[in-house]
Amino acid sequence: MAGVPVGALLPLLVGVCGAVTGSRVYPANEVTLLDSRSVQGELGWIASPLEGGWEEVSIMDEKNTPIRTYQVCNVMEPSQNNWLRTDWIPREGAQRVYIEIKFTLRDCNSLPGVMGTCKETFNLYYYESNNDKERFIRESQFAKIDTIAADESFTQVDIGDRIMKLNTEVRDVGPLSKKGFYLAFQDVGACIALVSVRVFYKKCPLTVRNLAQFPDTITGADTSSLVEVRGSCVNNSEEKDVPKMYCGADGEWLVPIGNCLCNAGYEERNGECQACKIGYYKALSTDVACAKCPPHSYSIWEGSTSCTCDRGFFRAENDAASMPCTRPPSAPQNLISNVNETSVNLEWSAPQNKGGRDDISYNVVCKRCGAGEPSHCRSCGSGVHFSPQQNGLKTTKVSITDLLAHTNYTFEVWAVNGVSKHNPSQDQAVSVTVTTNQAAPSPIALIQAKEITRHSVALAWLEPDRPNGVILEYEVKYYEKDQNERSYRIVKTASRNTDIKGLNPLTSYVFHVRARTAAGYGDFSGPFEFTTNTVPSPIIGDGTNPTVLLVSVAGSVVLVVILIAAFVISRRRSKYSKAKQEADEEKHLNQGVRTYVDPFTYEDPNQAVREFAKEIDASCIKIEKVIGVGEFGEVCSGRLKVPGKREICVAIKTLKAGYTDKQRRDFLSEASIMGQFDHPNIIHLEGVVTKCKPVMIITEYMENGSLDAFLRKNDGRFTVIQLVGMLRGIGSGMKYLSDMSYVHRDLAARNILVNSNLVCKVSDFGMSRVLEDDPEAAYTTRGGKIPIRWTAPEAIAYRKFTSASDVWSYGIVMWEVMSYGERPYWDMSNQDVIKAIEEGYRLPPPMDCPIALHQLMLDCWQKERSDRPKFGQIVNMLDKLIRNPNSLKRTGSESSRPSTALLDPSSPEFSAVVSVSDWLQAIKMERYKDNFTAAGYTTLEAVVHMNQDDLARIGITAITHQNKILSSVQAMRSQMQQMHGRMVPV
């Protein structure tokens, strides 16, 4: 070192080294990339020039640990340019690094004769590189970071006094992008010693905030940048809001956002989620601590989410986990009864122990017990009424009415709360036994007219529901409707029927009936109105002259012959005779023909069930398996064994629990309807179960299920005769219903059931008469939705359901049967179906469908309902086809499957057109004449082979026009194949 001996600096450097090696603990947010004090052995940095510039000096500290330093002190010579370069320093992902330099510098004023050449600064450079083996210093590659000046410099006196003047400077550089970099120190004439060089970058260290752990994160490239970091929840916790923090450029975490919550059964302790201790619990993921188990409960495991109730205590379903466990209440106290004829009033006091709950209510159980045999009791049944209600009472009194006279009753009053069902016990009830007094009979529910003539009405009625003793006699009160009870007559009878004679013809009379026992008369029934006839009925009785009888019979025969002849003549004029009166307006009853009675006309629907359906003891029924689910409950198969009869298989419809009175009434209405029918092609009602739960409807069991599914499952397996036989059975059943003036309204293959002998039976009689306005034309009813595709046009437009609309539906069923269960109108929407039918389109014949059957379908689909055949005519026609199988051999299509285009009855006769132009003009599609000509379709023989793709290819894209053309094409094709006649004479 020119001008200043190196030895003069060594004592001072030893002191300095002792100071800098005392501690090497750095902040947690700093990651060291290079620390010259930690290098074992020589640093081996490259100096330029190799000699006369920077020198590496090794000095021992007080622990005899070598400290490697670099010195330079060429203060005597001008124009110094001494470079010192570090080894390659890996970046390790840092975008900004910091250089900490500890150094000493000689005061130029303390050196004589160097004022022109001595400097008190040096320069710091860096160079980014992916090459860690560069051997030479290329000054032009380096970029200057800063000029470094000393805050304090030392003199010769300081050396003598061993005064330490160590400088520390920190500089940063970035952003960095390559794998590593080199640092360089340029001396321009200073007397300097580099004691240590440390290169580091800053990070935000791993930390836990709000139960979220944030990993070590390197700071951003700029001194003001913030790095967003998403945290992860610690063990046994879950996110409430997404946990985030920002890592600042100084390595400090800023702005915590979001947090995690300890899972159920865990609480926050010392920044962790630790399990709840024994005897504590936590039910939800919240930020609260574990809570001690509420009264009458405990936990025996760490991490409990709830506490177990003590023996005899319970928790209701809606009770929070924080609520104490409770128990059922004790029995009500001080039960008092007051009997008034066939009514009883009960009052009681609240139980002594409410079980720790406030939701106390009361249930009353009524039992009818035999005299002297209190242990032989049975439920009072549904005929007894409770006011305000039987169960869920909030008051401590109840009135019970409609009891039987002179009968022993036991009433139990149960106190219940939210946990009673977990441990029901007789300890929760108090009972009282009473005997009712004598009482008058209850009102009669129903009066029927068995026969009405010009001057008389034959009445019959059932015994009152509660006779309350022996009925001594009945009293009938009647009067003309117009008199409004101002003038009435009384007739008394000991039987439950009577003939009221001497009435005026064509007059409405109102009748009331009441019963009398030893306790007196009961109330009159409600009014029942009947109207006498205008024409006298023929009477043939004892003493009638045989000659007169013979003449009457002969006259009747002649009259029948005349009527038949008139019908034949009329039949020749019209295919089917038009009805003189709409079917739904025919109200007169033919003598000897049973007529359907609508159960909804009964004031008490239960009376209709009792009248038309047989009550079956539930013990006679064995349910075997569930075969389906209906609107009201499950449908099961099972067996019925009635005493004295053989066991049979049955289908069982059940009414699901929790039903309303309306649901029960609607459910049983189907039984009231079915019970009136007796025909081999109508599903047979075996009976009902109404006196216990579940309420059930029992019908015969049909092994093959619904007709549509059965046909799809057996596609193509039946002969045409077999299919026609099925249709004949359905038609026969519908004729029977029509003769009884019953309109089905929902005739479809899905509502026809098939037994093991392929006998088809009409079912599903639960359909409502109430239809909603629905723009989608799918009317909602109590029995489900009626698709438009089965419904006659007048029923859609005017809600006019008649036997004629059932005939339309029967035609659709015929199509379903012959197509083996295909969906009518395929995937067309309801609105498209309505529009197509209105425009005169009809379904084409299914594959291999005989012409005669398709013609019968088209007859059923006549727009005018009076033009449609009656069910009797349909059955006769099917009988003729069955007797003449050859008539079923001619089919309307030779294709493997029918076209999905509807048939248009307005299609022209093939024989009436001779060219494509004539044909297009006939169907009003002449606008497409050029399209056909350009595509080469110049003859009708070529046209009849076209399909929908062909039409689209020649430029006909409108769906309605495609359908119209294709329907006419199909009709022409059929005419060619059949040799005569049109296929769709609608």
UniProtKB/Swiss-Prot annotation:
Q: According to Swiss-Prot or TrEMBL, what is its membrane topology?
A: Single-pass type I membrane protein
On the Extracellular side, which residues?
20-547
What are its E.C. numbers?
Answer: 2.7.10.1
Q: Where is the active site?
A: D746 (proton acceptor)
Cite the GO molecular-function annotations of the record: ATP binding; DH domain binding; GPI-linked ephrin receptor activity; protein kinase activity; transmembrane-ephrin receptor activity
| Glycosylation sites recorded in the entry for this protein | N235, N340, N408
Q: Name one GO cellular component term.
A: dendrite
Q: In which tissues is it expressed?
A: Expressed at high levels in brain, with expression also detected in the kidney, lung, muscle and thymus.
Please list which residues make up the signal peptide.
Answer: 1-19
> Could you tell me which residue ranges the Fibronectin type-III domain spans?
328-439, 440-537
Where does the record place the SAM domain?
911-975
Query: Gene3D superfamilies from the entry?
Result: ephrin a2 ectodomain, Galactose-binding domain-like, Immunoglobulins, Phosphorylase Kinase, domain 1, Transcription Factor, Ets-1, Transferase(Phosphotransferase) domain 1, Tumor Necrosis Factor Receptor, subunit A, domain 2
Domain Eph LBD intervals? 30-209
List-wise, which residues carry Phosphotyrosine?
A: Y596, Y602, Y779, Y928
Q: Mark the transmembrane ranges.
A: 548-569
All copies of the Protein kinase domain together span: 621-882
Q: Which keywords has UniProt assigned to this entry?
A: ATP-binding, Cell adhesion, Cell membrane, Developmental protein, Endosome, Glycoprotein, Kinase, Membrane, Neurogenesis, Nucleotide-binding, Phosphoprotein, Receptor, Repeat, Signal, Transferase, Transmembrane, Transmembrane helix, Tyrosine-protein kinase
Alphabetically, which GO biological process terms does the record hold?
axon guidance; cell adhesion; ephrin receptor signaling pathway; fasciculation of sensory neuron axon; peptidyl-tyrosine phosphorylation; positive regulation of Rho guanyl-nucleotide exchange factor activity; protein autophosphorylation; regulation of GTPase activity
**Subunit organization:** Interacts with the src family kinase, p59-Fyn, through the major phosphorylation site at position Tyr-602. Interacts (via PDZ motif) with SIPA1L1 (via PDZ domain); controls neuronal morphology through regulation of the RAP1 (RAP1A or RAP1B) and RAP2 (RAP2A, RAP2B or RAP2C) GTPases.
Name this polypeptide is given? Ephrin type-A receptor 4
The source organism is: Gallus gallus
- Gene for this chain: EPHA4
